[in-house]
């Protein structure tokens, strides 16, 4: 009986001694810090204003992997100015709805190689939505500046 009591007290003492006595909050695990992606004219190989496809010098798959880590706005800096602001990077895997300008990575139409498109909303079935139409008008000036700049430096594909 005495041995059981001693064993119980040792077990209780060991359990209590191994508990942490500080109240510090556990820090969340994160990988790399999330940054907004910025593209410059040196990143863009060409842009097709008809289809709105943008071809980057970087490999599509590695660029797609990097962009998946971003959260929020993407910027196209041409010269010293931010010419075009994109609300989000989306892919064919995305089930969310966006009613503002997005950079869409399309892998369904060509499974061997994905393509990037600048679209006014995602998915495109919401193109006639009132909020999308308002944002199209709001972004018209950005689009004009973006296309004029790319024309000036010879990066428009027709």
Annotate each predicted stretch with a short phrase:
Residues 1-5:
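Positively charged n-region of N-terminal signal peptides that target proteins for export
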Residues 16-18:
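C-terminal motif of bacterial Sec signal peptides marking the signal peptidase cleavage site
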Residues 22-158:
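A structural signal for conserved, well-ordered secondary-structure elements
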Residues 6-14:
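Sec-dependent N-terminal signal peptides
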